[in-house]
């Protein structure tokens, strides 16, 4: 999921988790526990930790992703990717049998999210951009973009499918996009359409 601050990414991620088969082993990884996944019997919650006053004892999102991979998860949910941990989420988790893994990130639209993922991966691994783009294109299926519109409501604004890597770039296709049709009682009217 992508979107700006306050777009509803975490809320939407919680809602999406309701559709995960309840028998799956799910591991959540967060900086601060915000996810509220319900009804899953085999749920493991991991939370990052800051270093103490002596600068020791830090546990990063990247550390937790590596640990989660040894816990035999069916899927991994990272509350938000912000930096080099994206390498482990993409390369180690999503490309190694943990399909259906999910995360959120800040971006203005799905294409910007792809560029942010590329940049975050470059922070954590020394690979050519083309190799990173191929990994991202192989790991991701869709990006759901959320946003706050002018009446302050939160909406799914776009669903973008990742088709693969071709002609030197990640190929995408817009599946659905929010179309505004007007206003009524100061509320924006519209729907998400193909």
What are these regions (language model features)?
Residues 60, 128-129, 193:
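General structural signal for secondary-structure boundaries
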Residues 14, 18-66, 113-117:
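P-loop NTPase switch/communication element
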Residues 30, 37-40, 68-167:
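Conserved P-loop NTPase nucleotide-binding/switch module
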Residues 6:
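Walker A (P-loop) phosphate-binding loop of P-loop NTPases
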Residues 135, 152-194:
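NTP-binding/hydrolysis catalytic cores, primarily Walker-type P-loop NTPases
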Residues 23, 120-123, 178, 182:
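Hydrophobic alpha-helical segments
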Residues 9:
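Conserved lysine of the Walker
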Residues 1:
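Hydrophobic anchor at the beta1->P-loop junction of P-loop NTPases
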């Amino acid at each position: 999921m992508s979107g700006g601050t306050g777009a509803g990414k975490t809320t939407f991620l919680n809602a999406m988790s309701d559709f995960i088969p309840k028998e799956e082993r799910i591991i959540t990884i967060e900086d601060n526990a915000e996810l509220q996944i319900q009804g899953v019997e085999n749920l493991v919650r991991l939370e990052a930790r800051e270093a103490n006053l002596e600068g020791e004892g830090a546990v990063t999102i990247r550390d937790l992703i590596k640990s989660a991979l040894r816990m035999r998860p069916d899927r991994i949910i990272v509350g938000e990717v912000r930096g080099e941990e994206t390498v482990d989420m993409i390369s180690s988790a999503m490309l190694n049998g943990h399909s259906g893994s999910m995360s959120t990130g800040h971006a203005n639209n799905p294409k910007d999210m792809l560029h942010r993922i590329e940049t975050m991966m470059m922070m954590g691994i020394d690979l050519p951009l083309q190799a990173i783009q191929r990994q991202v294109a192989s790991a991701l299926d869709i990006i759901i973009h959320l946003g706050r519109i002018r009446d302050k409501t939160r909406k799914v604004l776009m669903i973008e499918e990742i088709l693969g890597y071709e002609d030197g770039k990640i190929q995408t296709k817009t599946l659905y996009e929010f179309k505004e049709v007007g206003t009524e009682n100061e509320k924006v009217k519209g729907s998400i359409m193909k």
